[in-house]
Amino acid sequence: MDVTIQHPWFKRALGPFYHNRLFDQFFGEGLFEYDLLPFQSLFRTVLDSGISEVRSDRDQFLILLDHFSPEDLTVKVLDDFVEIHGKHNERQDDHGYISREFHRRYRLPSNVDKSALSCSLSADGMLTFCGPKVQSGMDASHSERAIPVSREEKASSAPNS
């Protein structure tokens, strides 16, 4: 199959609807023909893409990530940031060896209680990082601290937005 190279300007016209598997959690697993067709990606869901979701409402701050196991993840809070590091060890597949690693950093809102942060992983691999919000006058200390990832026995029930 011949593949033409598109100038980035043409992809911009589709904006957030243009999904590229090269930049999601499936990186390193190979591309399918439909990944090279821009309009095919319009029909894929966000949950299928491995893209993280950040929610912040009046009561809590929430980060949702998927496709992980607890052994792959390290979660820590450093000052006003949550750092999530994941590493899949090298394994062999039909085409050679695959090794994946990622590092994501999210800024915490200033009114999140850093001493009450929690992190859990559902049975279907959905990581949920949650922190309650406090009144604006209260401020937690600024230091580095690891957040343990607890494992849930049931699948996630995170609603789609």
Swiss-Prot record:
N6-acetyllysine: residues carrying this PTM: 87
Positions where Deamidated glutamine occurs in the chain: 6, 40, 135
Positions with a binding annotation for Zn(2+) 1: 88, 90
A GO CC term assigned to this protein in UniProt: cytoplasm
Modification N-acetylmethionine, positions: 1
Keyword Ligase recorded: no
PROSITE patterns for this protein: SHSP
Region (Disordered): 135-161
Residues bound to Zn(2+) 3: 142
Assembly and binders: Heteromer composed of three CRYAA and one CRYAB subunits. Inter-subunit bridging via zinc ions enhances stability, which is crucial as there is no protein turn over in the lens. Can also form homodimers and homotetramers (dimers of dimers) which serve as the building blocks of homooligomers. Within homooligomers, the zinc-binding motif is created from residues of 3 different molecules. His-88 and Glu-90 from one molecule are ligands of the zinc ion, and His-95 and His-142 residues from additional molecules complete the site with tetrahedral coordination geometry.
Reported function: Contributes to the transparency and refractive index of the lens. In its oxidized form (absence of intramolecular disulfide bond), acts as a chaperone, preventing aggregation of various proteins under a wide range of stress conditions. Required for the correct formation of lens intermediate filaments as part of a complex composed of BFSP1, BFSP2 and CRYAA.
Name of this protein: Alpha-crystallin A chain
